Amino acid sequence: FERVGEIESQIWDANGHGKVDGVIALDTIVLQRMLALTGTKVTTPGGDVLDGNSTSDFLLNGVYKKYTDPAQQDATFALVANAAANGVFGNIGKVNIAKLASTIKSSVDEGRIAVYMANDNEEAMLEDFGFAGTVSSDTKVPETGIYTSACYGGKMFYYLASDIDVGKGVKNSDGSITYDMKVTFSNQLDSAELGTLTDYITNGGGFDGSLHFFVYLLAPSGGKISDITTEGTFYGADEY
């Protein structure tokens, strides 16, 4: 995430907003958890009430169902972001510290929060506390990265489900350890709902309701990925 933060900072500055000290990224689940902790509720221009239960689904999917005009979507996002920030920070003093710490820790562990600081010393501290969004370099506790990104427009990633199964390690004659890993992706959109969605969500055309995406596999530190097999439609692979 350090590189992402650097690029985002440069984009912000290049667009005339000035230099920033850092960049914070969090997903809609974190926002929903913070609203729940602080008892904050946000009402959208269309009358939807976002709270500790409904926020993530609305921001990832509901807003696109309700508003077909991107300008309306952007206005809703801006209002929600402003109201949520004011509500959360305005009520943060009333929150149980232990619950707040637990929520932040679990969100960081799940990769839902990442922070970048332009100051090298501050960035090093973030890395020590697990906030920097770095890839593990610990060869004794190997981590394999699995990342996805969409090939086309639309908002179909809301319907993407994934499951990862890591087998028990098998020690090889050279002392290395091999792990079998199975990654399963599935499309959770059913035909009944598909008929109610706009092309803006489903991609439209020949891709209507289907999921097309890139999968990036990052080998663990000191290790490698081998013997890849696939099922379903697969368009090939490159190694970097």
Give the location of each predicted region.
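Amphipathic, coiled-coil-like alpha-helical scaffolding segments used for oligomerization/assembly
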Residues: 2-37, 87
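Lumenal/extracellular ectodomains and adaptor appendage modules
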Residues: 1-6, 39-240
